């Protein structure tokens, strides 16, 4: 049996329709289908087919079939459409039976999300658990405060550049293998940090490798979310994933305080991160499947069947919602695409290998650079607040270390609320737009409308925080403005990340890596110079200037909302 009958019967590749007396073949790739046509009922499909004079899956178009042949053909057509109805997309009355976006069951997606959220927590935790121990490490290593603080600057610098490397490979070579490589490197480095003798040069080198290994988590995680979650739910999916990275700066100082409160146990900071990293590596190796779409498609194991085996199956993919016979330790090692058929490659194309040229093209792309710089400015304002908050609480408000740590809970909770509410509202507005504009492709830039609100909240919080400290307002006022700054920043970060992954789905990890690069560079510069600027300008005017800088983000987002459609969102 050849491949053509298999494609016509089971996959619905060729759909012939009568149009102006001619027969045409219509093909829609998976990435081109709109969400307004998903989950259409069987009655609606039958009604559309009744009103259209076309012959689906017609084996002999020139013949005049008998009545019995027509009945058999109709029955075969109904079986083909029903088998894909619950999970398919129907972009036009001419087309039926399309591939579901993902084959992974709900339970398996919960496992995937649990793992990537936990891994996402490890990266920021590795950087932030170290900061409360800086005075202690300064004494242990017998160096100046400037030298020991430089280990933080080096970490942030490498943490900014690292995602460019991981993001480039993640969109080409697979997610799971890179997770295993980065976690293995992180585990080795953390063990060495906990065990090597005191030597400042060794500390610098190991912190560089620690930052490089831990910098993979956000770009790989965002890519994984794009693999398994369709665009209509991606806003809240990104919000759930970002719970991990957002919790890192909140929990890490608390853990560090608990470890250090009983004495000189700073090595256990790295011991704790080693244990957490080891657990993550085991989870990834044992439970996480490969999800990169150009390798495994939508996750259906039948893509890997031989052609003759697939042809003998009544339904080539997606029979129900469960995945049977899933095994432990799946997809270990470097993976090749499970299928080389033209149909698979058309729907799940492999992007070209990444390099410096690719990133240069991304940086020159207005939607990417504007969104990345906008997020970086907001992130810089937040880090300026984060660095100065503890300093002024200790010197101006006479807070203890325990009280300072508790004060950070307020902006931390605001970060989580901003990410979650922004993600859910983004998806809700997207679904409303699709319902009011049937049969039209959703403009991804529509999500950025929410950024206007988040930017204004961040500007108000930033300026208000500076003047509240300048006039020595009550501590509760500081908490309110800090919450506004944190809420607005994560609100915008979530929406921007969702926008980039929807605009460039095949380069999700790469575009998020570029955005992370600008964001972390901004945070590193801001945290390094903010105290000097506050001393020179006064904290009120300094944070007013930061708020005005954030207004540049407002201009950039407005530009994209107005002129986005003049740019063609081509995959790189």
UniProtKB/Swiss-Prot annotation:
SUPFAM superfamilies xref list: MFS general substrate transporter
Segments in the Extracellular topological domain: 132-149, 206-207, 262-267, 388-398, 470-472, 542
Keywords: Membrane, Phosphoprotein, Sporulation, Transmembrane, Transmembrane helix, Transport
Main location: membrane
GO biological process: one example: ascospore wall assembly
GO MF terms, alphabetically ordered: amine transmembrane transporter activity
UniProt PTM: Phosphorylated.
Membrane topology: Multi-pass membrane protein
Domain of life: Eukaryota
Family of the protein in this entry: Belongs to the major facilitator superfamily. CAR1 family.
Name used for this protein in its record: Dityrosine transporter 1
Taxonomic source organism: Saccharomyces cerevisiae (strain ATCC 204508 / S288c)
Lineage, uppermost ranks: Eukaryota, Fungi, Dikarya, Ascomycota, Saccharomycotina
Gene transcribed to yield this protein: DTR1
